[in-house]
Each structure stands twice: as structure tokens, then as C-alpha cells.
Amino acid sequence: MYDLANQSFTLLIITLLFPIYFKDVAVGNPQKGDSLWSLGASGSLFLVVLLSPIVGSVADRHNKRKAVLVGTGVCCVILTALLVLVRPGAWWIGLAIFIPANIMYQLGENMLGSFLPGISTPRTIGKISAIGWTMGYIGGLLLLAVVAVGAFLLGWKDPEQWRPFFLIAALWFAIGMIPTMLFVKEPVATNHRAASASAGDRIRSAIAHLKNHKQLIRFLVSFFVYGFGVQTMIMFAAILAADFGIEGTRLILFTLQLTVTAGGTAIVVAKYQDRLGIRATILSFLGVWIASCATLLIVKLTIPVDPPEWIFWAIGNGIGIGLGGIGTSSRSVVGFFAPKHRTAEFFGFWGMSYKLAGAIGVLSFGQVKAWVGDAAALALLTGFFAVGLVLFLRVDLRSGRREAMRAERAHRVITHRGV
């Protein structure tokens, strides 16, 4: 249910409405808006990179994963509601609220992933991960339907009229969190070491243990590179759509189409990923990403001014397929490689890799788009996925799982001896 709840922030604040509102209304200058949005989004992700391993390690040692998940969610809800205060020209207020809101959201996403190994097995982890991802897209579809109907009935077609939707996003998140708060139990502690160590000691310890998981390191490097592209597309999807002439209510409908495609893909992944294999699944979706971004680049190079709107609608299906599949399959790899007693720490590193990728990718894409041009930015985006695919070919899933099992056996021996 938490995957369903936080879709309101993902869709309305990160992807769809707030980026356009910020660029066109709060800033009021397209070039400056692209630059400031990339700076704000990347800045928040850089801070998440610093916090992720600390939060993950502390949550593991104090057995407070649920508390961290709920706490970050509540903070994100409050800050999301405050976005209604961002009026025309007040871009600095928008950044002052969005940056901490995104930090809370991203830290919660990391913690949510750490629950995965405890509710699945190595055989079912792909399916369970995809089910959670699918719930998120179902929530997205319902929310977008509400927004589309509201925009149509109330005539809220222009970005200047979108501030009430930020309150709807906060309310949706708050209501959707209630089942998690009431019914999800704190996972049973598996790490009984003293909790008095400093944060620096925890990070050094986590890094020392990570060194024993070579395949996880290889995957994180690959994920880091193709994560540049995924995070960039999430942050700039609405802005790119607007560049192709998709605006107002049509922008909401485009996002609805993208979400339907992504949700359908997540359902397919939930059913077939464990059968097809995580490796084949990830390689397939990276191929879809490369084809989609390369097509956008070709269109921009051949039709630089006023490209046909229908082209972006068509390519949006490829983007939706990529979004729906690459996230859940990537999360499955981390769960597959993580020993159970260090899940929050290792998912913290996964989150750190993803957020650092987003920080670098969003910043570089936004600045290139603002100061060099759309074609150069799209070429950069295509390169992210291509290099990520090449690096992923070096990851050995079986070897990575054996590394996790060895770590679990060693931990059981140490725990049994009372060390």
C-alpha cells in the first residue's frame, strides 16, 4: 500500500505538475527554469546520497525500519502540502520546500526496499518486488484519473491553476500511508551488535562488508550509470512533453498513458520475471530505453522546430515500458544479493547509487538542455543507458547470490557464539 500512497509525490510533484508549474509560473523563464529545476532536484539527491547509508545503518542497528519509513512519509506529506504556498515568481520558496520534501520521499523509498528480503525468498523476490511496483502504478492510475476529471470539470488547464493539486497529492499520500502505520510490523531484528558505534563507524563497517560482495559492487556501478537516464527522465518527462507541444489537460492524459503502459509492464514483470530471469529482464528493458531515447534524438535532429506531437505520444509507450520494468527488476537484484542481516544497509547503498546517479544525471541533462540544446541533452541521455547496458553484462547473478549466502552463514556463526 505504501507503493500506492507515495505515487502522488512521484507523479504530481516530481514528474507531472510541479516541474511545469515551477518552470512556467514560479520562475517564468523556460531556460532559467530548466537550469534551476535541475539544480534543485540534483541538490536534493546529493543530500540523499550523504544520508542514505547513515539512515540505513542506524535503522538496521536499532531495528527502526518502519519508524523511519513512516517518519519520512509524514514529513513528505507536510512539505508537499506546503507547496501550495509557492506563487508566481516565488521560485526560491518552491526550492526551499521541494528539496527537503524530495529528501524525505527518497529516504522512504530506500527504506521501503529494505523490507523486500524479509517478505520473499530468492525464488519469489522478483515477483514480490514487481507486485509492489504494480501497486504503485495502480495508485498512479487512480490518482491521474482524479486529477484529469478535476482539471476538466473545474477548468484547471493552465499551470497557474494547479496549486490545489499539490494539496491533493499530500492528502493522497497521507491516506495511503494509514495501512502501513496500522498493520505493518517492525521486522524482527537480525543484527544484535551494539548500537553505540558512531555513524562514521557504521559507514566504515558497511563499506568493509560491501567489499566482500563484488558482484553487488559491479551491479551498483552499472545501475549508477543507467540510473542517470532513469532519474533524468522521471524529473524531465513533463518538460520534454511540453517541448513537443503537449500541454494542459493533454499533458495529464499523456502521463496517464505513460502510467498505463508502465503499470501493464510491471504486471507482466511480476508474472514472468522469475521465469525469464532478472538478467534477461534488465537487458531487455535497457534495450527499450536506448531505442526510445535514440528515437527522440533522431526526431530532434531531423525536425528541430515544432516536431509532430504524435511522435512523443508514440515514444511515450517506450518510456512507460522502461519505467515499469527497470525499477522493479533492479530492486530485485539488490534483494537477491543482500544478506538478510544487512538489508537496510545494502538497500541504503542502492539508494545512494540511484540518488547520486539522479543528482549527476539530472544536473548534467538540465544544464546541457538549458545552455547547449535539446539534441545534445538527448544524446547524453541515450549514452547513459548504452554504457549502463555494457557494464551490466559483467554482473554474475549466481556468484552474487553465493556471496550473500556466505555472509549469512558467517553471521549465524558469529551470532551463535555471542560475538
What is each model feature region?
Residues 279-327:
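C-terminal transmembrane helical hairpin of 12-TM major facilitator-type secondary transporters
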Residues 70-89, 287-305:
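C-terminal ends and interior cores of transmembrane alpha-helices
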Residues 79, 90-108, 307-325:
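Hydrophobic core of transmembrane alpha-helices in multi-pass small-molecule transporters
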Residues 59-74, 275-289:
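Cytoplasmic membrane-interface "Motif A"-like loop-to-helix N-cap segments
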Residues 50-64, 264-278, 369:
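Helix-to-loop junctions at the C-terminal end of transmembrane segments
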Residues 31-33, 150-171, 367-385:
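A membrane-interface helix-boundary motif in multi-pass transporters
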Residues 186-221, 411-419:
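Juxtamembrane intracellular "pre-TM" segments in multi-pass secondary transporters
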